[in-house]
Curated annotation (Swiss-Prot):
Main location, first listed in the record: plastid
Annotated keywords: Chloroplast, Plastid, Ribonucleoprotein, Ribosomal protein, RNA-binding, rRNA-binding
Subcellular location: Plastid, Chloroplast
GO CC terms, sorted: chloroplast; mitochondrial small ribosomal subunit
This protein's name: Small ribosomal subunit protein uS19c
Keyword Plastid in record: yes
Function text: Protein S19 forms a complex with S13 that binds strongly to the 16S ribosomal RNA.
Domain of life: Eukaryota
Taxonomic source organism: Zea mays
SUPFAM superfamilies per UniProt: Ribosomal protein S19
GO molecular function: rRNA binding; structural constituent of ribosome
């Protein structure tokens, strides 16, 4: 037997916010902490601010994003490169 495909996970509060905004004519930014929620076709065209651990990053949802997770589009880590403190390249004597 083959395995049954499970439904995509979407947080209930996020789904309620999407439905409420779809009823209105106006577009507004939807704020969420749910990075594990899947992107549904009902979310296309909305701007969702996703939490990255420090702040909310606004992401505009387009068609190719459907089926993926919200957290995939917001990086959580910031890379800082380490520069040498000395500017000269000559060896010290």
């Amino acid at each position: 037997m083959t395995r049954k495909k499970t439904n995509p996970f979407v947080a209930r509060h996020l789904l309620a916010k999407i439905e409420k905004v779809n009823m209105k004519e106006e577009k507004e930014i939807i704020v969420t902490w749910s990075r594990a929620s899947s992107i549904l076709p009902a979310m296309v065209g909305h701007t969702i601010a996703i939490h990255n651990g420090k702040e909310h990053i606004p992401i505009y949802i387009t068609n190719p994003m459907v089926g993926r997770k919200l957290g995939e589009f917001v990086p959580t880590r910031h890379f800082t490169s380490y520069e040498s403190t000395r500017k000269d390249t000559k060896s010290r004597r």
